[in-house]
Swiss-Prot record:
Protein name: Cytochrome c
Organism field: Strigomonas oncopelti
Modified residues (N,N-dimethylproline): 2
Location, primary (coarse class): mitochondrion
PTM text: Binds 1 heme c group covalently per subunit.
Domain of life the protein comes from: Eukaryota
Binding site for heme c: 28-29, 91
Length: 113
């Protein structure tokens, strides 16, 4: 049986997403143009970027070799459970279970360009 189709995310609120970013991602990631990598890579321009391509960041083999393009739809699945989506990733984040919070964070990430 094919997997059940995923429900599309509700519309996201970038202002709420910024708060989520600051509370859950900023300890490991930056989102500023030209910003330094931290424990995780700089997320400026993440939406529609190929995984494993931020210069100067040492990615896990799983991430570097994944071939993933970070579309909003892919980010939705990844952010729900990073380790399930990409076994072997270095990202230790447990994930965001609430669809609205993922939608808000993705709306914020879409503005980082």
């Amino acid at each position: 049986m094919p997997p059940k189709a995923r429900e599309p995310l509700p519309p996201g609120d970038a202002a709420k997403g910024e708060k989520i970013f600051k509370g859950r991602a900023a300890q490991c990631h930056t989102g500023a143009k030209g910003g330094a990598n931290g424990v995780g890579p700089n997320l400026f321009g993440i939406v529609n970027r190929h995984s494993g391509t931020v210069e100067g960041f040492a990615y896990s083999k799983a991430n570097a070799d994944s071939g993933v393009v970070w579309t909003p739809e892919v980010l939705d699945v990844y952010l729900e459970n990073p380790k399930k989506f990409m076994p072997g990733t270095k990202m230790s984040f447990a994930g965001i279970k609430k669809p609205q919070e993922r939608a808000d964070l993705i709306a914020y990430l879409e503005n980082l360009k």
